[in-house]
Amino acid sequence: MSIASDKLVKECEEKMVKTIEAVKEKFTAIRAGRANVSMLDGIKVENYGSEVPLNQIGTVSAPEARLLVIDPWDKTLISKIEKAILAANIGMTPNNDGRVIRLVLPELTADRRKEYVKLAKNEAENGKIAIRNIRKDINNHLKKLEKDKENPISEDELKKEETNVQTLTDKYVKEIDDLLAKKEKEITTI
């Protein structure tokens, strides 16, 4: 067993895990029918001359299925938070009562749900492509190791490691499929 080939297979798994995390992050950004505090993650608010993430200047909660509440720690920032939400164009209009900001999620139409499912499928496919590209790169590195003059690996070891890489590929592609099925159900559930 070659240390170099083991290292490549470990590197392969690490990259695939990072790809899965990226797909999960993309899925979080796709809105389902329920309010989720992560829907506001990308919003930055101007605070004392710098852009600060919304979740760092107040508490963001989802007390109901279609309601987000932002409770800023500094109440003087309410108008700036409102402006940032409107500028982010997230499809919600902020309601300000002077203490907190409420965001009511509009009901998703059937067409909008289909769009979100399509978007989720696209992100899942991009994740699978990334996983397969990682497999291809690692297999190419393994083949170079087989031809290495100083420290070659045997043909049997090459086949064994390629099988390990394929097993990892299958595992993570299935995980993406499972994540997609879960996200589709979340989007289509009314």
UniProtKB/Swiss-Prot annotation:
Example of a GO biological process term: translation
Per the record, its GO cellular-component terms are:
cytoplasm
Q: Where in the cell is it found?
A: Cytoplasm
- Which molecular function GO terms apply here? ribosomal large subunit binding
Q: Which Pfam families does the entry link to?
A: RRF
The answer to keyword Protein biosynthesis applying to this record is yes
Q: Which residues form a coiled coil?
A: none
Q: Which UniProt keywords apply?
A: Cytoplasm, Protein biosynthesis
Keyword Hydrolase applies: no
Alphabetical list of CDD domains matching this protein: RRF
Checking InterPro entries in the record gives:
Ribosome_recyc_fac, Ribosome_recyc_fac_dom, RRF_sf
Read off the Gene3D superfamilies from this record.
Answer: 3.30.1360.40, Ribosome-recycling factor (1.10.132.20)
| Protein family per UniProt | Belongs to the RRF family.
PANTHER family of this UniProt entry?
MITOCHONDRIAL RIBOSOME RECYCLING FACTOR PSEUDO 1 (PTHR20982:SF3), RIBOSOME RECYCLING FACTOR (PTHR20982)
- Function recorded in the entry: Responsible for the release of ribosomes from messenger RNA at the termination of protein biosynthesis. May increase the efficiency of translation by recycling ribosomes from one round of translation to another.
Protein name from the UniProt record: Ribosome-recycling factor
The top of its lineage is:
Bacteria, Fusobacteriati, Fusobacteriota, Fusobacteriia, Fusobacteriales
